[in-house]
């Protein structure tokens, strides 16, 4: 039998072509990073947001690639392999959430962030939108980004380490350091432009991989009859409701709520050349997402028949895609498919590093140095941004050094944190003139705290009553909405300029 750390690694070791393909992939990323560095002007907005000059297709695939991460290629197939089609509820929720995000958030955010002092980060937008002269809102939202994104980034590093450990039998820590080095290099030097171009490139690779693997697997098994074989082996795995209560379905479906507040995703909307390009981005982005997620589900289902057919002992379901790519394909193609996993992992890490870096630079360092210094010392701020990338990466690597949770759980916790603290605030800021600074701060903090409390103390009580097992984004989101609204109603109304700006944003968005 093949096991993930022994026979399979020996097979890969014998095929040097696989290493060549991985090396070529890394080289391409380094070249793109160097290109981004050569295009840099020393302007902070250019480094952090690409000068708001990104086209619709790069916007679409970079948003998708940075969103899906290693979860789409490793986490989701593993979940479907283990539990069956019931895992599809999360894909339905995500696709619907992303689709709504393009309509509800994207156009207004692109217009409003430029109108509100040309904000290049979410905290900066919140500050300008709510006239936060004391920077309380900016500091708190910046802290939430730094804390949750460090957690989120470390999950990506865990995926990278797992990949090299599983596919090549290499030390987990070696894989962790290698992935970190490449990501840090092109993010550090190339900034937002390099990250966006690499994400587009990586998005293409991911899509090809998610289509190829299940199709070739079925061709090598029993064609479309593979699904009949799966039904015979594990009939309940084709049941959408297997092992799920109403609470379980709602929890999976509710992942879509998080889209409105994920900084590394909605920053893509802020950087597109014009809000008028967003429909093109939406069509490509949602199509890419739907095909990719369906491919991931297909990998998990075909894996149920594949593993026993090839006499494989699968110790970790999240390595299913790795096993299939190495057993089914020529080493060169297998190397390409491993590069697809790296693409999924690294595209998310780089985006998260850059957003965290921009928050540390724009939302904290600028407060120390002052607005005037920021205008006259742009190169200094770009360098601080680069150093912030390095610092955040080192902290995330340290946390990832001893992994003790599944990829899906790690991502789920961070996703809920942003979804509960930022999603309601983003929606209120874009649509409601009655939002106040006190309401924004209270809602944001309460949402984040509810998520933390739910994870730490409420979820462990799920064995007592299943309601306690509810995905933490739901109670966090609800509490944040209520607190934001109530506190805003009880505090001083914002100035008339808010209604004027909201009307202006609405009119611009309606322009054809």
UniProtKB/Swiss-Prot annotation:
What GO biological process terms does the UniProt entry carry, in alphabetical order?
Answer: proline transport
**Origin: domain of life:** Bacteria
Q: Which residues cross the membrane?
A: 16-36, 54-74, 85-105, 139-159, 174-194, 200-220, 247-267, 286-306, 327-347, 381-401, 410-430, 438-458, 467-487
Instruction: Please report the record's description of how this protein sits within the membrane.
Output: Multi-pass membrane protein
Alphabetical list of CDD domains matching this protein: SLC5sbd_PutP (cd11475)
Please list the reactions this protein catalyses: L-proline(in) + Na(+)(in) = L-proline(out) + Na(+)(out)
Q: What is its main location?
A: membrane
Subcellular location per UniProt equals:
Cell membrane
Family affiliation: Belongs to the sodium:solute symporter (SSF) (TC 2.A.21) family.
Spell out the protein name for this chain. Sodium/proline symporter
